[in-house]
């Protein structure tokens, strides 16, 4: 099915209108059968159709357009804004999140960790750190009244 033309309808009316062919063309089968058996309602209906054809074609095309229109669905997505500084909602069952700037807490039952991670790295070529009380390599020997060292001298 497609839209119908007024010119084609007038041509069908002129040559075959007494048999109602123009009515069948415009999907009006009941009046087409009536015209077929009465010779266009005794020529009177055939003559009146000269004025009715433009309206019949317009009605047919309007029905055709309304049946073949595509429907467009518009979907709107609403997003909840997240403001800086406000806590975000955690999913169900997730542990609570620490506020920014607070030191992380240990999970329940976990061994304690260093508060700030690994010790800082020494620069390349620097001697390794010594335990407390031991003089660094190359330092002067202590002087003064210290107890004598153990063992032979």
UniProtKB/Swiss-Prot annotation:
Where found? Membrane
Span-the-membrane segments of this chain are 6-26, 33-53
Q: Which domain of life is it from?
A: Eukaryota
Q: How does it sit in the membrane?
A: Multi-pass membrane protein
Question: Bias category Pro residues: which stretches?
Answer: 93-153
Keyword terms, alphabetized: Membrane, Repeat, Transmembrane, Transmembrane helix
Please tell me one Gene Ontology term that the record gives under cellular component. membrane
- Residue ranges of region Disordered? 85-153
TM2 domain: residues covered? 3-50
Instruction: Locate the region 6 X 8 AA tandem repeat of Q-Q-P-Y-G-A-P-P.
Output: 89-136
InterPro entries found in the cross-reference section: TM2, TM2D1-3-like
Query: Where do the sequence repeats lie?
Result: 89-96, 97-104, 105-112, 113-120, 121-128, 129-136
What would be one Pfam family of this protein?
Answer: TM2
Q: Which family does it belong to?
A: Belongs to the TM2 family.
Name of protein: TM2 domain-containing protein DDB_G0277895
- Read off the lineage from the record: Eukaryota, Amoebozoa, Evosea, Eumycetozoa, Dictyostelia
């Amino acid at each position: 099915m497609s839209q119908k033309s007024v010119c084609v309808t007038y041509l069908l009316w002129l040559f075959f209108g007494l048999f109602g062919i123009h009515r069948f063309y415009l999907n009006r089968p009941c009046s087409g059968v009536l015209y077929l058996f009465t010779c266009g309602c005794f020529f009177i209906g055939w003559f009146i159709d000269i004025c009715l054809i433009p309206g019949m074609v317009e009605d047919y095309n309007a029905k055709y357009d309304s049946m073949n229109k595509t429907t467009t669905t518009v979907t709107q997505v609403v997003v909840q804004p997240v403001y800086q500084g406000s806590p975000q909602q955690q999913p169900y069952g997730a542990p609570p999140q620490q506020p920014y700037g607070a030191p992380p807490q240990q999970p329940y039952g976990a061994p304690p960790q260093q508060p700030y991670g690994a010790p800082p790295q020494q620069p390349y070529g620097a001697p390794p750190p010594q335990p407390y009380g031991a003089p660094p390599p190359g330092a002067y020997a202590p002087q003064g009244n210290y107890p004598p060292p153990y063992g032979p001298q």
